[in-house]
A protein has these predicted regions:
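N-terminal helicase ATP-binding lobe
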Residues: 1-154
Length: 154
């Protein structure tokens, strides 16, 4: 219990210190925008077996082992089912690619990226007009307040 309370107090302290009044941005619980977007795109050729399995088992804890190209990324996003999630990858380049895929292909705006170079990444997006306020997105990523955070293993 102590760790949970300490973690919440730290999060609230960081949130208020950053000038925000809310610790969490609205989640995808009710609209399930990301899940719906993925299903709509895959409607033409259908979900792969691993994607169907994870979508149907979203109330279970799962470990998925599958070769490259089997659809694990979308399967994990379907498994989230609108819940808050952290998608962790080993490399910055991989994190950037998955972030862009989720943001652009599925038009999901409630995703942030957090790694050693994410501040630079957000400012680059701001310069390229992909994002309007890079610093604010970076702060929200650091607060872990968005429904989906793409990050690297430290």
């Amino acid at each position: 219990e102590f760790v949970l309370i300490k973690g919440l107090l730290n999060k609230f302290d960081y949130t208020v210190s950053a000038g925000y009044t809310e610790a969490e941005d609205c989640s995808d619980f009710t609209t399930k925008y990301l899940k719906t977007s993925i299903e709509n795109i895959f409607q033409q050729h259908g979900l792969r077996p691993v994607q169907e399995y994870m979508r149907d088992k979203c109330d279970k804890n799962l470990v998925v082992v599958a070769p490259t190209g089997m659809g694990k990324t979308e399967a994990s996003l379907l498994w989230l089912n609108g819940e808050k999630g952290f998608y962790t990858l080993p490399y910055v380049v991989s994190s950037n690619a998955i972030y862009e895929r989720i943001r652009d292909r599925y038009e999901y705006k409630d995703v942030t990226i957090l790694h050693s170079d994410s501040m630079h990444y957000y400012f680059e997006d701001q310069v390229n007009e992909t994002d309007s306020d890079g610093y604010e997105k970076y702060q929200k990523a650091k607060l872990l307040s968005q429904p989906l955070t793409i990050c690297t293993v430290v």
